[in-house]
Amino acid sequence: DAESTGFINNRARLSLGYERDRLSIGLSAQHVGVWGQDPQIDKNGRFILNEAWAKLDFGSGFFAKLGRQSLVYDDERIMGALDWNVAGRYHDALKLGYENTNNQMHLILAFNQNDEKTIGGTYYAPGAQPYKTMQTLWYKHLFDKSFNASFLFMNLGMEGGDAEKQNSDTKYLQTLGTNLIYTPSNWTIGGTIFYQFGKTKSG
């Protein structure tokens, strides 16, 4: 029989926000680890920025948000902050949006590399963000106080090239679906349908 074990996993997060006129800035730094795993004198701390973004409001409902940010949509099955996990989840992306009383539309664009390559193409080595490129369009409409619907299309580009030769071969996987919420009186009824097509990084 396996022996029982015990440990304490800890996340310490410090968040700062700044707003002025049409500009908003968000910074969030965190340290994640198990108690006792770091030496008392540590020259290589694991303190990272999990959020660092700037948002500019253009007026009339239009805005742009650039930088490291959480992407949280609907019930978070497809895109969420994953804050139940000790580390959480973040994306380096540009978000363009329009919002009014009954409508929200967001376009999210991302391009990832894990090295400052100046030659040799755009091969994206594994081990960092799971995707190389991302384009996501999300739209939500509030029909009335009891019913709203959202639609999402996501195109993920994942590196499927030769790791030894570092030849890039991007494979594209698409996700398309809707999230419906109906709230009559004290009840909430929800439905979610999604379909995936395209190719994974293995083909």
Indicate residue ranges for each PLM-predicted region.
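"Short basic amphipathic alpha-helical interaction patches in structured regions
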Residues: 41-42, 78-84
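Short acidic (Asp/Glu) patches
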Residues: 48-49, 78-80, 90
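Beta-barrel outer-membrane channel/assembly domains of diderm bacteria
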Residues: 1-71, 94-105, 141, 178-196
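Signature for the C-terminal beta-barrel architecture of outer-membrane proteins
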Residues: 60-64, 82-203
